[in-house]
């Protein structure tokens, strides 16, 4: 008895796939970032992993490789003002839309980390823990994270009293203590409950 050709019935994967991820949804300060990356299958980037498990030096080195070897990449953000007016989820989706729209080539499929994705002009697939499973999403997570970390160093230069270079805007005991001492700055997210608690107007 002839066996059916199961593989022949499967739809082929799109040729141009973008990985999409964000950085900075949880912090109390700074913009939320997103990146989109289309990797070159002929020039793979070794060592890709979820940005959260990599050391800062590893992330920076990989970011250089990704920017040099990817077919296309783009990093975008949504500002603190957009976060406060839209809410953090909508602002994150906006940053992702901007990242995909900024790519030099249009993807046929966007694979987005997590279980929520923005509306895009191409097909979209969400992937739980995609930053650890899909190389293009790992690459996007690294570019988003390194871009956001660089932005927090810029904020530290403007507002050194908050220690943004240490906690990157997250609600650490150090950050909360400095908030009590100084009150919030313009780059703190007024819509976040801890900032409201410290007297943000």
From Swiss-Prot:
Major localization listed first in the record, in broad terms: cytoplasm
PROSITE patterns: RNASE_H_2 (PS51975)
Cross-referenced SUPFAM superfamilies: Ribonuclease H-like (SSF53098)
A GO BP annotation: DNA replication, removal of RNA primer
Enzyme Commission number: 3.1.26.4
Domain RNase H type-2 intervals: 15-201
Signal peptide: none
Listed transmembrane segments: none
Compartments, record wording: Cytoplasm
Keyword Metal-binding among UniProt keywords: yes
Co-factor requirement: Mn(2+); Mg(2+)
Residues reported to bind a divalent metal cation: 21-22, 113
Co-factor: note: Manganese or magnesium. Binds 1 divalent metal ion per monomer in the absence of substrate. May bind a second metal ion after substrate binding.
Keywords for this protein: Cytoplasm, Endonuclease, Hydrolase, Manganese, Metal-binding, Nuclease
Molecular functions per Gene Ontology: manganese ion binding; RNA binding; RNA-DNA hybrid ribonuclease activity
Pfam families: RNase_HII
Gene3D superfamilies membership: Ribonuclease H-like superfamily/Ribonuclease H
EC top class, as a word: hydrolase
Disulphide linkage map: none
GO CC, alphabetical: cytoplasm; ribonuclease H2 complex
Family membership noted in the UniProt record: Belongs to the RNase HII family.
Function, in words: Endonuclease that specifically degrades the RNA of RNA-DNA hybrids.
Protein name: Ribonuclease HII
Species name: Bordetella pertussis (strain Tohama I / ATCC BAA-589 / NCTC 13251)
